[in-house]
Regions:
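Catalytic cores of nucleotide-sugar-dependent glycosyltransferases that transfer UDP/GDP/TDP-activated
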Residues: 2-499
C-alpha cells in the first residue's frame, strides 16, 4: 500500500488545478484551492500544486514579489500524435510548493478559459496538457503522491487516462496513488466530439452510455466521476441535489450509481480564509469592527453610500449582490424585482463581471434607476470589501449554488444573507423567522419574484427593530466557516482511502 505507515509519515497530496489564488483567479475555485492547500499543509500534509503558467500568473507573481525558480526539467506528453512540451517552474507560497507548466502556445493568453465570444476551441488540448503534464511533473520532481486531488473537468483527463491510456495505466509510479475528484461546478462538463478519445489514447469502446458518452459527446466530467476512487462536491446538500434530474445537468444517473457504490460521493462544505476576510484587520474598509464592537459597521455603511452616490439615511437598508454575472446566480430574478425592491425601501448595489449580454443589461438598468441603484462591473477588490463591510444585507437568489462563498464572507462582515434555499446556501444559512435563537439570515425557496420579495419583507421588518438587528449581526459574525473543519474532513477521507 502507498501509506501503510500513513500515521508515521506525511501524506503526499498532489493538487491539479486550473486556477489558484493568488496566482490566477476566475471564480471561487481559486479561493478554495489557495486556502485548502495551505490548510492541509498546516495539518502536516506534504501538498504540491500543479497549475498552468498563464500570462496572468506571471503578472501576479511580479506584483507578489515571490521568487520563481526555473527547474532544469521539461515535461513532454503525446497528444493527438504530437509531442507537447512545457517548461517547469517552482514557487513556494507559504507552506505549499506550486509547480507551473509554461507553454505559451496554450497558456500565454489574456484569458484563462474563454474570450467574450466563448470558450477556447482548443481547451481539450490546453487542459489535456495540464492533466498529463501534472503527472509528468510529479515524476520529474520524484513526488509519488498518495492522493491525486483533481478539481473540475479541466483535470478530468487524469482519472480517465490513469485508468485507460496505454503506458499510463501500467505506470508503476502511480500504482498506489488514489484519485479524489471534486466537482465545484457541475454545469461545466468538458464535452467534446468523439475524436478527443483518439487524441488522448482513450479506447474507443468507452464511447458508450456506460462510459464517456453523453448526448452524443465525450463527456470528460462523466469519465472522471466513473474512474476516480472518490468523488466529492462542495456541500452536503449539493451532493444530494445533483443526484436529481433538476440539478444533475444530465449526470444524475451516474452520480446516483457512484453514490450507491461504497458511498463514493460525498459533500464537504467549502470554507473561507478567516485571515484574508477579517473586518478587524481589513485595510480596505472604512472602519474596522468586530462581533464585540459592531457600532463601526454603520460607519462603513454611511461612507459606502456616500461613495456610491446613494441616500445616506439609515432608513433605507443597503442590499448588495456580489457575484459572477451568470444566469445561474439569479441576476434576472433580481433585475425583474427591482421596482418592487425599491418600493419596499431598499437601496441596491450590484458588483460583478461575467456574460457580456448581462453586463450590457446592467448598464441600461443603472441609467434607469440611478437614485436607488449603484452598479460596478469588474469592480476592484477594495470596492468588493467595502461593499461586504458596508451593506446591511446580501442577496443570493441562485438557481443552484454548489456551495457559495459570498454568504460566508457576508456573515463574517455582519452582512445578513437573504438566499434561495439551494445547495450550500442551505448548509450555511439558517432562517431567522424559523429559528430566532440560531438564525443568521433569511431563506426563500421558490425561484419567483413573490418568494424573493416575501423574504425581503421579513428581513426589513427585523432591520427596523434595531435591537433585534444588532443581535442578528453579532450572531452572524460569530459563525465559523473557516477551513478548519473542512480541511480536517478532507484529510480524514484521504486516510480512509489509503487504509
Amino acid at each position: 500500500m502507498a501509506t501503510s505507515n500513513a500515521n508515521k509519515t506525511k501524506l503526499k497530496i498532489l493538487f491539479v488545478v486550473s486556477e489558484m489564488e493568488p496566482f490566477a483567479k476566475v471564480g471561487g475555485l481559486a479561493n478554495v484551492i489557495g486556502t485548502l492547500s495551505r490548510r492541509l499543509a498546516g495539518l502536516d500534509c506534504d501538498v504540491r500544486v500543479v497549475l498552468p503558467y498563464y500570462k496572468e500568473v506571471k503578472k501576479n507573481l511580479r506584483n507578489l514579489k515571490l521568487r520563481v525558480k526555473r527547474l532544469d526539467k521539461r515535461i513532454s506528453t503525446s497528444i493527438d500524435w504530437l509531442v507537447e512540451e512545457g517548461e517547469l517552474y517552482e514557487v513556494k507560497y507559504k507552506d505549499v510548493k506550486v509547480y507551473l507548466i509554461e507553454n505559451d502556445k496554450y497558456f500565454g493568453r489574456d484569458q484563462i478559459y474563454a474570450t467574450p465570444k466563448g470558450e477556447f476551441e482548443d481547451n481539450d488540448m490546453r487542459f489535456g496538457l495540464l492533466s498529463l503534464g501534472a503527472l509528468e511533473t510529479a515524476k520529474a520532481i520524484n513526488f509519488k503522491p498518495d492522493i491525486i486531488h483533481c478539481h473540475d473537468w479541466q483535470t478530468a483527463f487524469i482519472p480517465i487516462c490513469l485508468k485507460w491510456r496505454k503506458h499510463l495505466k501500467d505506470d508503476e509510479f502511480f500504482n498506489n496513488s488514489k484519485i479524489v475528484f471534486t466537482i465545484h461546478n457541475i454545469s461545466y462538463q468538458g464535452q467534446f466530439d468523439k475524436v478527443i478519445m483518439d487524441k488522448f489514447g482513450i479506447p474507443g469502446f468507452l464511447f458508450t452510455s456506460q462510459g464517456l458518452e453523453l448526448y452524443g459527446k465525450a463527456n470528460l466530467l462523466k469519465g472522471a466521476i466513473l474512474y476516480s476512487n472518490l468523488v466529492t462536491t462542495v456541500s452536503p446538500t449539493f451532493a444530494e441535489e445533483i443526484k436529481k434530474r433538476e440539478y444533475g445537468h444530465g449526470l444524475d444517473a451516474v452520480l446516483k450509481w457512484v453514490s450507491r457504490k461504497s458511498n463514493n460521493l460525498q459533500g464537504i462544505l467549502d470554507g473561507i480564509d478567516y485571515e484574508l476576510w477579517n473586518p478587524e484587520t481589513d485595510k480596505s474598509i472604512y472602519s474596522k469592527f468586530s462581533s464585540k464592537e459592531i457600532a463601526s459597521k454603520s460607519t462603513n455603511t454611511l461612507k459606502l453610500k456616500k461613495e456610491l452616490g446613494l441616500n445616506e439615511s439609515e432608513e433605507f437598508p443597503l442590499l448588495c449582490f456580489v457575484s459572477k454575472l451568470t444566469e445561474q446566480k439569479g441576476l434576472d430574478l433580481l433585475l425583474n424585482s427591482l421596482p418592487q425592491i425599491f418600493d419596499l425601501g431598499y437601496q441596491v448595489v450590484i458588483l460583478g463581471s461575467g456574460e457580456a449580454h448581462l453586463e450590457q443589461i446592467l448598464r441600461r438598468v443603472n441609467r434607469k434607476f440611478r437614485k436607488n441603484l449603484s452598479i460596478a462591473i469588474k469592480p476592484s477588490e477594495d470596492l468588493e470589501r467595502k461593499v461586504y463591510a458596508g451593506s446591511d444585507m446580501l442577496l443570493m437568489p441562485s438557481r443552484f449554488e454548489p456551495c457559495g462563498l459570498s454568504q460566508m464572507i457576508a456573515l463574517r462582515y455582519g452582512t445578513i444573507p437573504v438566499v434561495r434555499g439551494t445547495g450550500g446556501l442551505l448548509d450555511t444559512v439558517i432562517d431567522y423567522n424559523q429559528d430566532k435563537k440560531n438564525g443568521n439570515g433569511f431563506i426563500f425557496h421558490e425561484f419567483s419574484k413573490i418568494s424573493l420579495l416575501d423574504a425581503l419583507i421579513r428581513a426589513i421588518s427585523v432591520y427596523e427593530d434595531k435591537k433585534a438587528w444588532a443581535k442578528l449581526i453579532t450572531k452572524a459574525m460569530k459563525e465559523d466557516f473557516s477551513w478548519k473543519k473542512s480541511g480536517t474532513k478532507y484529510k480524514e477521507i484521504y486516510q480512509k482511502l489509503l487504509a
